[in-house]
Amino acid sequence: MSAPLKNSDPVTVDVALGDRSYDIVIGRGILPSLGERIAALRPGARVAIVTDEYVATHWLRATEASLLGAGIATSRIVVDEGEVSKSYEGIEFVCEELIKARIERNDLVVALGGGVVGDLAGFAAAIVRRGVDFVQVPTSLLAQVDSSVGGKTGINSPQGKNLVGAFHQPILVVADTAVLDTLSPRQFRAGYAEVAKYGLLGDEAFFAWLETNHADIVKGSAARESAVAASCRAKAAIVARDERETGERALLNLGHTFGHALETATGFSDRLYHGEGVSIGMVLAAELSAQLGMIADADVARIRRHLATAGLPTRLQDIAGFRQEGLADADGLMALMAQDKKVKRGRLTFILLQAIGQAVVSSDVEPSTVRDFLARKLADAPA
């Protein structure tokens, strides 16, 4: 049984997308308000809650109680925990369960969980009956600051991360920071990588604030809500300007070109969480930027130092069993990166750094340069 939630005044961040705009509501102890918020948005709608086994143990009962208290009929769909559910088999299961539950276009799907559940439930909502609205109730730090915002949904392919999906914006995001108390330390750290990302890509002052306040964010003080809100504001602003990732939104993929390849190489397993891959990927992107003469070595050292202080991996050798087949091979990693969603006309696209808080999108890095860079990084790692 989870500890009782203690309320705080919520912060609301608007994702401005015209008639598809929606609110991100952030606060401690706000999960019980979910039912009344949904009832106000969709009177009479039924709700199918999609969650995973771990989250169901902690938060499904409270979520159902909130919905039922607002007079909302509910059903539940529980999937396996982890990336294993973000698959063709996983999306088939959720879609069939939604159809069996007779969820109609005027009903709602509620994604109660971390990034995997949000991506999976959102994709199912996008394609069942050619589109059902959905609400994100993110329960991991990573989901609260990143994956629940912006409408990217989808599943993995054996060929790579997030290669099958759709843009489908939620109608509401309710981020209760109290639920983060049930995360394991490793899960929390993995989510923190995405928080640090916002400072690196466009806000040096925020990165400096994180360096000072990281310990308080971990403790769950008001600094945690501030970090979540600042991250959501940063992402919401970019999404409002570039919803479909035709330009600026690509900056949000800082660290992801390398990181997704590493996740694929490790079989989407517990060897490497998504945020851990992003952490290593951001350091690699910074180091590649330095090699290209774009960023000062002192900035790279500062990035590496803060991520390491936060308990995140920063080197390839930090990955468990990194010498296994498919990881410790530069050509293999290059092949995986060639499947990245940002590839255009066969050329890799990287998010590189000119300084902390100054990121740029580049398709000008020669593949041979990247391959040699990776080969050196792999050779640096002890056997």
Curated annotation (Swiss-Prot):
GO terms for cellular component: cytoplasm. It comes from the Bacteria. Its EC number is 4.2.3.4. Keywords: Amino-acid biosynthesis, Aromatic amino acid biosynthesis, Cobalt, Cytoplasm, Lyase, Metal-binding, NAD, Nucleotide-binding, Zinc. Gene3D superfamilies: 3.40.50.1970, Dehydroquinate synthase-like - alpha domain. It is an enzyme of class 4 (lyase). It is found in: Cytoplasm. Its cofactor is Co(2+); Zn(2+); NAD(+). Pathway: Metabolic intermediate biosynthesis; chorismate biosynthesis; chorismate from D-erythrose 4-phosphate and phosphoenolpyruvate: step 2/7. Transmembrane segments: none annotated. Belongs to the sugar phosphate cyclases superfamily. Dehydroquinate synthase family. This is 3-dehydroquinate synthase. The lineage of its organism: Bacteria, Pseudomonadati, Pseudomonadota, Alphaproteobacteria, Hyphomicrobiales.
